[in-house]
């Protein structure tokens, strides 16, 4: 009889959501047996309340300087997938360098990815409204550059370094989506979440009108 050592099989890592989603080359793979994205407005409102309470705690100084990260969104369980044969379908030219199967927390992570697209769209709209003659133009450009290009983008996409576009949706669903080097968004991503992320990324790269959540 094989004995499973739970402590060795599951390692915990306390990190912020931003740290988790900003890992270089990270792709999140949702197994087919996991339910589709199904959160309604009540679930999203609860997540926003949790975020708000955490930010208020930081503002009140109730969180120490060395832990000023948003660490209050619950547990996320992932498993590193090193065998590409377990990813289906697969384009071997477009596999991210780090694949994590998302076992628990996919509704939260998916919602956060969608929220990041909303913030990205809004920040870009604000930046475009500020004219170069405005005294704060450079500061606004710098803020947008830091938050959009260095933070928000990494929450819903990863840079493959090749393909058209080089940015790919961070989250896909088994048997419905596959990371692709050059195929169209509609060919590669058929789940509602990944299809939206794919079209959002394409519009961002092409500098065209960014889609909105319906």
What are these regions (language model features)?
Residues 2-214:
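Glycine- and hydrophobic-rich flexible loops that cap the catalytic core of alpha/beta enzyme folds
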